[in-house]
């Protein structure tokens, strides 16, 4: 970036995507400041690294800034944004700043409706094990690194490419992954699925002539756009025509064992026997994307196998909190947390839980995310929520949206009771959810907390406060 830009301010610095970029810029030697409405692990980490973090938004916060970075979650009437515009300080969208970072390295961009964070983390881990020391910016905390971003000394930067606001079209990577294409964030695309698919086609057109599009051909919508991708393609998945193909996949003690058949550049690579330290067939697909990239970049097979076997996961992606004592003290239940908030990814995670813990009762504590998504996917939510053995259902996490009639937690509860697949317990306040979990959990249960909103704090509360919690509370 130009030498005149020395001080960079982030509005909403605690967000997953924003904090990662801020950390990389700190490590590059820039002076970084930022504001957010509250404190979280990301803001505390950035402060410990030297960033100036302010709580609350105020025009005075941008003093001395040469550029102000904003995400789509920041409204145009934010006082810091208004002050920056009045002072003619550049207001830079998060994706544009990420694109600038990609110009410093060779970009590997991971796109898709589901699986971006896990796939990005797997790619970064495999490349790191292969000695390529990548820079990475991830939407979740990579447990092995203790952070969601890192400045590496190697040539590559691995980052998520966000289709939710079409901002991935700002990026110009040399390698792209598309994990899947599903109907989500449809407001961005005028509720026109064809426009969403066209955006992914345009994303592949950002590649240079020597670039590679790594595409999951198990997904019917990815397969549908395949004829319109003009750049070199590597197909991965379980499908017979996949060039990076998994066969004989099976769940063993919470891990996935499978063999990878590889046919690239006109010849077959030796089969690769893999143990992935994650559950679920969807994570096998995510790992195949990492294997495809690693094989293209000539990472040794031994490094690929080691990275996947020793993968420590990502925060809030099937994150295991271990065993928790039941309220009556007669046994324990297993507590798992996941970020899933779309019916497709929820179904994949619940299937993975069944595979990882066969024969055990599955209890789901779910907080829907956004009223628009609840409205648009209402019947699919009812279907997937009806597959669990017991359900605790919270009110929708609004994420800034106004309520929509018949698209809230109570409406889902009523629909589930009519469907008669599971008897849901509606938990009106999130503060009541830890107690509701303790009330519901029996010895031997697997309890999964799920959602992209405030429910992410609940597992820690259950673990840290399990002693004071007794039977009773929310019904």
UniProtKB/Swiss-Prot annotation:
Principal location: cytoplasm
Keyword match Lipoprotein: no
Classification via Pfam families: Mur_ligase, Mur_ligase_C, Mur_ligase_M
GO molecular function: ATP binding; UDP-N-acetylmuramate-L-alanine ligase activity
Keyword Cell wall biogenesis/degradation among UniProt keywords: yes
Keywords from the named record: ATP-binding, Cell cycle, Cell division, Cell shape, Cell wall biogenesis/degradation, Cytoplasm, Ligase, Nucleotide-binding, Peptidoglycan synthesis
Name of the featured protein: UDP-N-acetylmuramate--L-alanine ligase
């Amino acid at each position: 970036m130009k030498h005149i830009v020395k001080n960079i301010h982030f509005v909403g610095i605690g967000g997953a995507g924003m904090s990662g970029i801020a950390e990389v810029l700190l490590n590059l030697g820039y002076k970084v400041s930022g504001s957010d409405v509250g404190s979280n692990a990301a803001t505390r980490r950035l402060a410990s690294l030297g960033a100036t973090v302010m709580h609350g938004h105020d025009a005075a916060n941008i003093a001395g800034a040469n550029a102000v970075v904003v995400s789509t979650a920041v409204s145009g009437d934010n006082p810091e944004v208004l002050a920056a515009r009045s002072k003619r300080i550049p207001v830079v969208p998060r994706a544009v700043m990420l694109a600038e970072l990609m110009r410093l390295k060779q970009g590997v961009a991971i796109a898709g409706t589901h699986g971006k964070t896990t796939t990005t983390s797997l790619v970064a881990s495999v490349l790191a094990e292969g000695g390529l020391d990548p820079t990475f910016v991830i939407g979740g905390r990579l447990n092995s690194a203790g952070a969601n971003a890192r400045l590496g000394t190697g040539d590559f930067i691995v980052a998520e490419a966000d289709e939710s606001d079409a901002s991935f079209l700002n990026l110009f990577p040399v390698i792209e992954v598309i994990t899947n294409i599903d109907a989500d964030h449809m407001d961005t695309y005028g509720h026109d699925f064809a426009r969403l698919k066209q955006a992914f086609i345009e994303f592949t057109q950002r590649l240079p002539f020597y670039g590679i599009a790594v595409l999951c051909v198990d997904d019917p919508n990815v397969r549908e756009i395949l004829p319109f991708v003009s750049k070199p393609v590597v197909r991965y998945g379980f499908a017979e025509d996949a060039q990076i193909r998994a066969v004989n996949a099976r769940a063993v003690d919470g891990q996935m064992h499978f063999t990878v058949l590889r046919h690239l550049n006109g010849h077959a690579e030796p089969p690769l026997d893999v143990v992935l330290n994650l559950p679920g067939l969807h994570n096998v697909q995510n790992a195949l994307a990492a294997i495809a990239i690693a094989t293209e970049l000539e990472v040794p097979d031994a490094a690929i196998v080691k990275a996947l076997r020793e993968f420590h996961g990502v925060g809030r992606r099937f994150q295991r909190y271990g065993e928790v004592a039941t309220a009556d003290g007669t046994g324990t239940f297993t507590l798992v947390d996941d970020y899933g908030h779309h019916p497709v990814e929820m179904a994949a995670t619940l299937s993975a839980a069944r595979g990882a813990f066969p024969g055990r009762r599955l209890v789901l504590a779910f907080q829907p995310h956004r009223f628009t998504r609840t409205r648009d996917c209402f019947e699919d939510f009812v279907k997937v929520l009806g597959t669990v053995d017991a359900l605790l259902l919270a009110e929708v996490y609004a994420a800034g949206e106004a309520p929509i009639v018949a698209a809230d937690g109570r409406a889902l509860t009523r629909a589930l009771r009519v469907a008669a697949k599971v008897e849901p317990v509606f938990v009106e306040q999130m503060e009541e959810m830890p107690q509701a979990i303790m009330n519901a959990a029996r010895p031997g249960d697997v309890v999964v907390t799920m959602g992209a909103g405030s429910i992410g704090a609940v597992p820690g509360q259950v673990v840290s406060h399990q002693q004071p919690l007794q039977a009773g509370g929310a019904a």
